[in-house]
């Protein structure tokens, strides 16, 4: 999970914003630290040249420095954040090569469901995408608030029950990358991570064809079983997926996941003795 090794245009832009922000803050922090040691050395008791001015009360020049430097820092940091947040709007399309790949994401307890509506397949806890193609994520939650994050691809986005969010990313190079939940969601939160395989276009096409040959079908009944709480779930591929399933999840026409029990996790996945 190396945010300083971006593998997509969004992550690369995020890195620039982070480095620019750190540089602006260091421009204040470093001189301040140097000044602390310089003042301590200059005003030491053994320095006869240091002037003691007990009646000193005000200096317009010092006031100008004290207020202008923090103000400029805030303006610069605010400008970087403002421009960057608008340029990297998660819903803004990413210019890539090839046809966009749509992936519908559902956060469950405690696993990730990925539906490929155009290919009519689905996976659990694993994603495969073509290198260079725009990846259009549409996200929701079947349980509590969660967050979807692939650090080397770019921005994090929240998933919420009964609504959707959008995220556009792109993989610049082939490889296997780390994806995770970055928002605490209960007892199995630490298990909500998944590999992201970025492959050339021809390999992606072959993977879709292979996935369609074997595996179960994802329909409302299968989703009902999948939405039950469980931990450390292995990756699954579905050879076929109901194209309207995601809409039914968002509009809550299907029963949502049970969610963590009131004040405590499900004993089925986290048995513990009462004190």
List each language-model region with its residue ranges.
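Non-transmembrane, membrane-proximal soluble domains of secreted or membrane proteins
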Residues: 1-19, 40-275
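Alpha-helical transmembrane segments
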Residues: 18-45
């Amino acid at each position: 999970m190396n945010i300083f090794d971006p593998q997509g245009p969004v992550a690369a832009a995020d890195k620039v914003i982070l480095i620019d922000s750190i540089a602006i803050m260091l421009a204040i922090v470093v001189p301040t630290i140097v000044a602390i040691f310089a003042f301590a050395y200059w005003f030491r008791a053994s320095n006869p040249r240091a002037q003691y001015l007990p009646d000193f009360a005000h200096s317009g020049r010092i006031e100008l420095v004290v207020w202008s430097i923090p103000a400029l820092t805030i303006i610069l940091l605010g400008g970087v954040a403002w421009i960057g947040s608008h340029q990297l709007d998660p819903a803004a399309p990413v210019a890539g090569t090839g046809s966009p790949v749509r992936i519908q994401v559902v956060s469950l307890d405690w696993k990730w469901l990925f539906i490929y509506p155009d290919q009519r397949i689905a996976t659990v806890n694993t994603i495969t995408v073509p290198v260079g193609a725009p990846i259009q994520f549409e996200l929701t939650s079947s349980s509590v608030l969660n967050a979807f994050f692939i650090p080397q691809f770019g921005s994090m986005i929240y998933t919420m029950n009964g609504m959707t969010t959008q995220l556009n990313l792109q993989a610049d190079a082939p490889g296997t990358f780390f994806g995770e939940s970055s928002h605490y969601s209960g007892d199995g939160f630490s298990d909500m991570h998944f590999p992201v395989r970025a492959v050339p276009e021809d390999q992606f096409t072959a993977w879709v064809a292979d996935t369609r040959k074997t595996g179960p079908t994802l329909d409302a009944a299968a989703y009902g079983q999948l939405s039950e709480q469980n931990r450390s779930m292995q990756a699954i591929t579905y050879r076929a997926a109901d194209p309207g399933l995601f809409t039914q999840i968002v509009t809550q026409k299907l029963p949502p996941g049970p969610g963590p029990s009131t004040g405590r996790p499900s004993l089925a996945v986290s048995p513990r003795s009462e004190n």
